[in-house]
Swiss-Prot record:
PROSITE patterns: CHCH. One of its GO terms (cellular component) is mitochondrion. This is NADH dehydrogenase [ubiquinone] iron-sulfur protein 5. It is found in: Mitochondrion inner membrane; Mitochondrion intermembrane space. Accessory subunit of the mitochondrial membrane respiratory chain NADH dehydrogenase (Complex I), that is believed not to be involved in catalysis. Complex I functions in the transfer of electrons from NADH to the respiratory chain. The immediate electron acceptor for the enzyme is believed to be ubiquinone. It comes from Bos taurus. Residues 30-74 form the CHCH domain. A motif (Cx9C motif 1) lies at residues 33-43.
Amino acid sequence: MPFFDVQKRLGVDLDRWMTIQSAEQPHKIPSRCHAFEKEWIECAHGIGSIRAEKECKIEFEDFRECLLRQKTMKRLHAIRRQREKLIKEGKYTPPPHHSGQEEPRS
């Protein structure tokens, strides 16, 4: 037990904010993955962790993708590789504002 409980003195509950994104946020702004987490929690609530692992797999995968963005990053990496390949082959020339050659606007 801490000598001076800062969270209690300030009236904030950082532990709840950091564990569940669906919890009430300090500025009333929902987190990016609020909807996905809520669906997963609603699906898994009351059925136990073993059943929830099987029955709520789709909801959990959606929530995980929203948090980590692994599929999105993989897709962006593939697009970037294709773009670089086309530039190297001479089939695509990026616009000047993409390569930093255009003068800045005033």
